[in-house]
Amino acid sequence: MKDRDAIALISAAVTKPGGVWADLGAGSGVFTRALAMLLGPDGTVYAVDSDPGSLRELDRSTGTEATPGAMVRTIIGDFTGPLDLPRLDGALIANALHYVSYSDQPAVVRRIASLLTEAAPLVVVEYDRTHVNQWVPYPITPAALTALTRDAGLGTPAILATQPARYSGTIYSAIVRR
């Protein structure tokens, strides 16, 4: 996915510059870079991923003139467990929640929500599909996301944007608050 596609999916969620956000399951940073650009130089993005190689790649692609924006701090860690992060003005989990088993998803979403300030958004980017494969072992349709966020004690998500997925189907972004 290109940075501009990631920006198109999440831009409606970033309503003001600055703030402290986390990109959970950041990988090599496509959505981290998009978020950093949207937040601008007064923002901070904590990019959390369990793969040190992906985070090294992310470090190489941020903080340069070619990718201006928020300060990006990489953290090697598993977003499904406890995280040592400050209170967040927003959290993004893009193309990562579908790796968490259905039985663990509510607890993970509750844990992430506990890091958010009162009105802060949780932004989710996922594939709108039901077909399971090795890349999307636990698909989360918009309807499934609604059930998940309600189970986790959050509100009803609103779809922000959709676009064709690279290989098949659709990718969507959604925002949810308490």
Describe each region flagged by the PLM.
Residues 89-103:
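A short SAM/SAH-binding and catalytic strip from SAM-dependent methyltransferases
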Residues 22, 28, 33-81:
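Class I SAM-dependent methyltransferase SAM/SAH-binding core
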Residues 1-19, 34:
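Conserved alpha-helix/loop element of class I SAM-dependent methyltransferases that forms part
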Residues 119-127:
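Conserved beta-strand signature within the Rossmann-like core of class I S-adenosyl-L-methionine
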Residues 106-118:
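A short glycine-rich, Lys/Arg-flanked "PGG" loop and its adjoining helix->strand segment in the class I
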Residues 130-144:
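Acceptor-substrate binding/catalytic loop of class I
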Residues 80-91:
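A short acidic, Gly/Pro-enriched loop at the edge of an enzyme's catalytic core
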Residues 161-178:
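Core SAM-dependent methyltransferase catalytic element
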